[in-house]
């Protein structure tokens, strides 16, 4: 099952990246949120969700997701998320 879980996360992360490239923020929000219900440890799903909110100037929503990530991710993954969001 672990192999399928990793394959799912890899596929979802590629989809989320492409949705960002196309500025399809509504689909990005929906799919990232769904991915996080299945794989709450998916740091990249948090990244794309937060980044899309930032692109739309929805700073309160971005801050809310960042707070959720802090609660749900291990500290090292949360720190990686913070670093990636600073780029």
Question: What are these model-derived regions, one by one?
Answer:
Residues 1-38:
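Alpha-helical adaptor scaffolds
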Residues 11, 45, 78-79:
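TPR alpha-solenoid repeat register
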Residues 14, 48, 81-84:
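Canonical tetratricopeptide repeat
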Residues 63-87:
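Terminal, low-structured helical/coil segments at or just beyond the last alpha-helical repeat
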């Amino acid at each position: 099952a672990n192999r399928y879980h990793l394959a799912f996360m890899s596929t979802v992360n590629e989809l989320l990246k492409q949705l960002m490239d196309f500025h399809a923020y509504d689909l990005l929000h929906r799919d990232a949120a769904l991915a996080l219900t299945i794989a709450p440890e998916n740091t990249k799903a948090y990244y794309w969700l937060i980044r899309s909110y930032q692109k739309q100037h929805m700073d309160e929503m971005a801050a809310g997701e960042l707070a959720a990530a802090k609660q749900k991710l291990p500290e090292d993954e949360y720190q990686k998320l913070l670093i990636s969001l600073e780029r």
